[in-house]
Structure formats: C-alpha cells, structure tokens
Amino acid sequence: MKLSQLFWGELKNEAANTRRILAAVPLDKGDFKPHEKSFSLKRLAVHVAEINGWWKETLLQDELDFSKGDYKPVEINSTEDLLALHDRLVANAEKILSEVSEEEFAKPWSMRNGEQIYFTMPKGEVARTWCLNHLYHH
C-alpha cells in the first residue's frame, strides 16, 4: 500500500470525527477564550478546519515562509460556513494525496521565517507531524 493511501485512510477517518466536533461548536459563543493568551473558540474552530489545507502546502510546495505574510484566517459566519471550509479542504487533501508520487514524501521541506529556518525534514514526516498529529493535538 502506498504512503499516500495510508495517509488518506487516516485523514478520512479523522475528518469524519473532526466534522462532528466542528458541527457542535457553539459559534454564538465564538468569542470565548479560556485564557487571555488563547485563541477564541471561533478562531480555534477555523484553525482546526484549516489544518486540512496544510496538505497542499506540505506536498505541493517545498517550504512555508512566514516572512511572506500571505496568510489570512478564513472568516466564517455560521456552522454551515465552518463545515463547508472543512469539507472543501478535506476534498482537496484527498485529491492531492491521490495524485502525489511516493517520491515526493522523501523530498525536504522547510518551515522558515525569512533567513531563519525552524526545521527541514522530509515531506512525509511533515505530513505526519503537521497535517495529522497537529490536528489530533487540537
């Protein structure tokens, strides 16, 4: 079995569980923060949905450079918006995983901020750590 198939099987199962949790997020309490340094509930829900988009950055690019400052959090206004974001990004991850070569998982990928490199590791390790384990973390 290919690594991409293993990743997709795991993501598919986790995505179903994540979707159920996102559907239960009380967005009328979206401003709630358990601590002043915490994300708001709404921002955390969007973050969890957006993690499914990281497959694109991981497998179709060779680095993520924060100095480019091109990230803007998605604005959602309803549970339907949140679930649509989640579903769209999971479908895109499925497409990417169905098309990626096995060789791509061995290529190096870096997270950086301009000249400062936080880490470089094979894309397969990045996918496991940041696309799956980070999702479980939340």
Model region roles, listed by residue range:
Residues K2, N77, R88, V126, ...:
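Short, conserved clusters of charged catalytic residues that mark active-site
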